[in-house]
């Protein structure tokens, strides 16, 4: 990841065609690390989640690997990203079907799982901000990744990227992007923003905020900023790093 800022349901997830899916359990190795840099800001506004072993219960014996990772690129303060760090993984886990008995039934509703989790986190943070005077202005992008066996599912809002490095036949690496950049210049985003009466100026909403989907950003909720994530999935191959 790079920090910056159902049946039919799964048809809205895009997947890259593959030739060599991983089959062996021993190939399911997950190494996780993180790095962060404050830059010129007065405080660190970005957070992350690393859960290489994301426990969904002992009864999920059909899972050889289950991991959860996330990055939150905060802006206008650290409170939104910190709230996401403390609540997002639980919100996702709580929405995984408890009655799932196989991989298909577990993954069938993942788009709803992520969409509802993002909405719950956003609602919770917005409610918290409104308890303070003045109301907090903090906001954050959110990119969450769940790895289940040889499948990667990525949900995101904002412009923090998730990328898989895939080795080509000549040995070089090619990036496979698993996120969608949500910015006011994109047609769908701009149309939604303009319907509220806001304008897109210099690539920003009313010349201020440069992402069109986020957690928090209370002053911009009425100007078309939403928290609905896009979801992509990818089948890992033996050529993926």
Cite the ranges covered by each PLM segment.
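PP2C/PPM-type serine/threonine phosphatase catalytic core
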Residues: 1-241
């Amino acid at each position: 990841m790079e920090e910056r800022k159902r049946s039919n349901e799964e048809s809205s997830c895009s997947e890259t065609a593959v030739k060599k899916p991983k089959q062996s359990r021993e190939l399911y190795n997950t190494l996780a690390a993180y790095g962060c840099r404050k830059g010129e800001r007065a405080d660190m506004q970005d957070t992350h989640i690393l859960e290489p072993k994301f426990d969904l219960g002992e009864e999920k014996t059909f899972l050889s690997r289950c991991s959860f990772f996330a990055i939150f690129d905060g802006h206008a303060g650290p409170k939104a990203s910190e709230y996401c760090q403390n609540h997002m993984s639980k919100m996702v886990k709580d929405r995984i079907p408890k009655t799932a008995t196989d991989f298909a039934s577990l993954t069938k509703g993942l788009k709803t799982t992520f969409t509802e989790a993002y909405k719950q986190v956003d609602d919770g943070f917005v409610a918290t901000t409104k308890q303070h005077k003045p109301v907090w202005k903090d906001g954050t992008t959110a990119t969450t990744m769940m790895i289940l066996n040889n499948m990667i599912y990525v949900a995101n809002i904002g412009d923090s990227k998730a990328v898989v490095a895939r080795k080509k036949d000549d040995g070089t690496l090619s990036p496979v992007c698993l996120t969608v950049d949500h910015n006011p210049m994109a047609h769908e985003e701009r149309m939604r923003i303009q319907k509220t009466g806001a304008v897109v100026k210099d690539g920003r909403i009313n010349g201020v905020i440069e992402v069109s989907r986020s957690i928090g950003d209370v002053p911009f909720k009425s100007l078309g900023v939403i928290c609905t994530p896009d979801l992509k999935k990818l089948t890992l191959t033996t050529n993926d790093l």
